């Protein structure tokens, strides 16, 4: 898709061939039949949805007797949904996902979901869930009431009185230092900070020259956040000084000339940056990736202007990157190559080519045999994966990887960091991460 504004929702999804053109392709192509991977009556650690899932978040609070996952749909029709799933572990140690009654219908695709961070001194059994589509919405459910508890909308926040005038919201982040604040990014080039207790916007600013695709608060801060957008830059803002922003990173400026857009733009801009993940253990570190790119850029705000490292391992476009909570060295990525990869920045790379690894079918969610260097793989079908030699300028290779059946659109870490929830096709699956 050469015209970024051709479809206003084509930038709000981030699946398949990236945030920019996936929905445009989805609308213009015949509907593809996606198989039901998890058969009825079999307890796999997975779930078949009647729609294509994208938005995803695993509840990070361990105070509940069960674990919960929220996921949202990406439907072309004005019929979208948020569904809660309960992860149940039996006495034999095997787990399966159970559909809860907590679900709700929405008109527009859900671009992001996040459970509220832990609040100091909070002892309530109710939990807040935030979502974005045309509005920032807050939902509430009572986990102690079990899977029959409904998902109730507590607020729908918008800077416009008329909802149909809203530009789609692409992403948001919950402030972990003060959960009463949420920052939201939009296609209209703005970021808005909301006080969800007062249900009022604290400030709205023009964050980028073009559409904003993702936003994140920095560790331990209620004032500083970073954003990425179609202008190809990572920008940092301080709510105490909004008269300027700091450009932390800008990529290659030849993108638009290669793709036939904005050839007369001055100055030239780089390939759009689609998603951003800020490390919650080191305020200086974050990860991002470009449109139509299989690489992940590692950013250190103490060294602005360039990526301090590039993660190269995917064979297709990257769709998501997430730091492991509580870690400043481990993160997970997924992409159009149907692969989920775990990276450890503290692990040295062996300079010899990674070995060829054959893996036969395994139980969904379980890892296959491991290699000292790279890529144990999980698959329902037998497969062979041949790893290529590392590029000379690549400092890292995946610690391990899983090969799935379709493009992997999103992922989320478990509360104990021992699992990854991933969505692909019409399925959600839990991958067990070796400790």
From Swiss-Prot:
<feature type="modified residue" description="Phosphoserine">
    <location>
        <position position="266"/>
    </location>
</feature>
<feature type="repeat" description="WD 2">
    <location>
        <begin position="164"/>
        <end position="204"/>
    </location>
</feature>
<protein>
    <recommendedName>
        <fullName>Uncharacterized WD repeat-containing protein C17D11.08</fullName>
    </recommendedName>
</protein>
<dbReference type="InterPro" id="IPR015943">
    <property type="entry name" value="WD40/YVTN_repeat-like_dom_sf"/>
</dbReference>
<feature type="repeat" description="WD 1">
    <location>
        <begin position="105"/>
        <end position="149"/>
    </location>
</feature>
<dbReference type="InterPro" id="IPR001680">
    <property type="entry name" value="WD40_rpt"/>
</dbReference>
<feature type="region of interest" description="Disordered">
    <location>
        <begin position="352"/>
        <end position="371"/>
    </location>
</feature>
<keyword id="KW-0333">Golgi apparatus</keyword>
<dbReference type="Pfam" id="PF00400">
    <property type="entry name" value="WD40"/>
</dbReference>
<feature type="compositionally biased region" description="Low complexity">
    <location>
        <begin position="358"/>
        <end position="371"/>
    </location>
</feature>
<dbReference type="GO" id="GO:0005794">
    <property type="term" value="C:Golgi apparatus"/>
</dbReference>
<dbReference type="InterPro" id="IPR045159">
    <property type="entry name" value="DCAF7-like"/>
</dbReference>
<dbReference type="InterPro" id="IPR019775">
    <property type="entry name" value="WD40_repeat_CS"/>
</dbReference>
<dbReference type="GO" id="GO:0080008">
    <property type="term" value="C:Cul4-RING E3 ubiquitin ligase complex"/>
</dbReference>
<dbReference type="InterPro" id="IPR036322">
    <property type="entry name" value="WD40_repeat_dom_sf"/>
</dbReference>
<feature type="repeat" description="WD 4">
    <location>
        <begin position="313"/>
        <end position="353"/>
    </location>
</feature>
<keyword id="KW-0853">WD repeat</keyword>
<keyword id="KW-0963">Cytoplasm</keyword>
<feature type="modified residue" description="Phosphoserine">
    <location>
        <position position="388"/>
    </location>
</feature>
<keyword id="KW-0597">Phosphoprotein</keyword>
<feature type="repeat" description="WD 3">
    <location>
        <begin position="207"/>
        <end position="247"/>
    </location>
</feature>
<keyword id="KW-0677">Repeat</keyword>
């Amino acid at each position: 898709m050469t015209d970024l504004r051709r479809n206003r929702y084509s930038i709000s999804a981030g699946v398949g061939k990236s945030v920019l053109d996936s929905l445009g392709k989805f609308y213009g192509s015949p509907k593809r039949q996606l198989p039901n991977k998890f058969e009825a009556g079999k307890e796999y650690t997975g779930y078949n949805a009647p729609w294509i899932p994208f938005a995803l978040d695993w509840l990070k609070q361990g105070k509940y007797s069960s674990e919960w996952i929220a996921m949202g749909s990406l439907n072309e029709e004005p019929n979208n949904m948020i569904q809660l799933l309960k992860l149940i572990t039996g006495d034999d140690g095997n787990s399966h996902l159970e559909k809860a009654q907590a679900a709700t219908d929405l008109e527009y695709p859900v671009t992001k979901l996040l459970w509220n961070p832990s609040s100091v001194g909070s002892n309530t059994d109710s939990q807040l869930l935030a979502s974005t589509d045309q509005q920032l919405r807050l939902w509430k459910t009572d986990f102690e009431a079990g899977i029959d508890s409904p998902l109730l909308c507590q607020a729908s926040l918008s800077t416009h009185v008329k909802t149909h005038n809203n530009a789609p919201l692409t992403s948001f982040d919950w402030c972990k230092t003060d959960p009463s604040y949420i920052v939201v990014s939009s296609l209209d080039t703005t970021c808005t900070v909301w006080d969800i207790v007062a249900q009022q916007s604290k400030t709205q600013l023009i964050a980028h020259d073009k559409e904003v695709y993702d936003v994140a608060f920095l560790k331990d801060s209620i004032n500083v956040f970073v954003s990425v957008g179609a202008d190809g830059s990572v920008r940092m803002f301080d709510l105490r000084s909004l008269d300027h922003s700091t450009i932390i990173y800008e990529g290659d400026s030849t993108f638009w000339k290669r793709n036939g857009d904005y050839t007369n733009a001055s100055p030239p801009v780089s390939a759009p940056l689609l998603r951003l993940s800020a490390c919650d253990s080191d305020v200086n570190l974050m990860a991002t990736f470009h449109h139509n790119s299989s690489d992940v850029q590692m950013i250190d705000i103490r060294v602005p202007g360039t990526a301090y490292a590039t993660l190269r391992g995917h064979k297709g476009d990257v769709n998501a990157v997430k730091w492991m909570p509580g870690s400043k060295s481990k993160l997970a990525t997924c992409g159009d190559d149907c692969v989920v990869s775990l990276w450890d920045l503290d692990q040295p790379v062996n300079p010899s080519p990674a070995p060829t690894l054959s893996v036969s079918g395994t139980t969904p969610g379980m890892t296959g045999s491991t290699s000292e260097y790279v890529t144990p793989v999980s698959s329902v079908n037998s497969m062979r994966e041949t790893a290529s030699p590392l590029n000379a300028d690549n400092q890292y290779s995946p610690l391990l990887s899983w090969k799935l059946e379709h493009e992997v659109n999103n992922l989320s870490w478990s509360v104990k960091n021992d699992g990854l929830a991933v969505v692909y096709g019409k399925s959600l699956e839990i991958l067990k991460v070796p400790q």
